[in-house]
């Protein structure tokens, strides 16, 4: 392989990998843990606006999150269905609110190199899946979620 061909292949690999990164401003992502996906409960459901893990199936907007950069490597997560933001709620449960103005509601995604990310807030809290149909809670330990681009 010539030097020119090698450079071309390397360039494709670098830019191809960069375009696959789901973590960027205004990107739409889905956050999952095994066969469960993070979603926002809707008005009319028990505990509306709380964030729960439900079985994967057809991808809907209540499972989609839009990243909004707040500077540096932190983001607000806006639910595509409601337009509300992921925040820490009462008793360390995650829910959504009309604004994410507190720094503790700004999140960083740290890749583990396998397509999974530890999500941490500026207050060093980490969302943790507690299983099927349970609310997502804040934890002090790292927890790696699969983060993928939306299937739109």
From Swiss-Prot:
The keyword Signal applies. Residues 1-18 form the signal peptide. One of its GO terms (biological process) is vasodilation. Keywords: Secreted, Signal, Vasoactive, Vasodilator. It comes from the Eukaryota. Salivary gland (at protein level). The keyword Secreted applies. It is found in: Secreted. Salivary vasoactive peptide; induces vasodilatation in bioassay with rabbit aortic rings. This is Erythema protein SVEP. It comes from Simulium vittatum.
